[in-house]
Amino acid sequence: MISNNKYDYIICGGGATGLLLSSALISDNFFDDKKILIIEKEAKVDNDKTLGFWDSKETILDEVVFKEWEYAEFKDSEFHNSFLLNPFKYKMIKSSKFYSHLGEKISDADNFTYLNATIENIDQENKIVKTDNGEFQSSIIFSSIYDDKEIKFNKYPLLKQHFIGWTIETKDQSFDDNKITFMDFSVDQKNEIRFMYLSLIHI
């Protein structure tokens, strides 16, 4: 357990949201003298996700971008359109590179502490985070941890959205890897809303 359990800021969750927030705090001199704790259940090292985002400018993640596209297409069974994304680009990052890139930045920050622990409770009123490795206090607590209680008690209709992806290799260059396909609705809808992305990479 960490002996000094009081921090200026605690970040609960070391996924994309927590790491990007940590990076932003590190980049701002205002936080140089602030003690910051980031808590994540397990070390993030595997390539367990594919991250995609739009941007029209350089970002702190550009050096780990695996692929980017300037052209895109949209289609369904009766419609097809290709277009230039300018001034935007769509960028793709492998999560293992994302974790290591921002993880190194956090490790180099003297005012940051990274703790692998399971969060058991977040008390926002008293500003206490309880984990299986002790309790920690902070003036401000950030949390990106999913809480299904918010879903269960929401009175409005909710839609569940989930994605699954495959990596497909072809012997021939069967696709245009300069173009990304967004929302291909030509697939069987099966009384739902279904679409496909095609993120094409020439190896």
Predicted region positions:
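N-terminal FAD cofactor-binding segment of flavoenzymes
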Residues: A24, D28-F30, L37-E78
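Short, solvent-exposed loop/turn segments at secondary-structure junctions
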Residues: A16-T17, A43-V45, D147-K149, D188
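Short, well-ordered alpha-helices that flank and scaffold nucleotide-derived cofactor binding pockets
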Residues: S23, S27, E104, L200
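Glycine/serine-rich loop-strand microenvironments at binding/catalytic pocket rims
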Residues: M1-I11, L115, N133
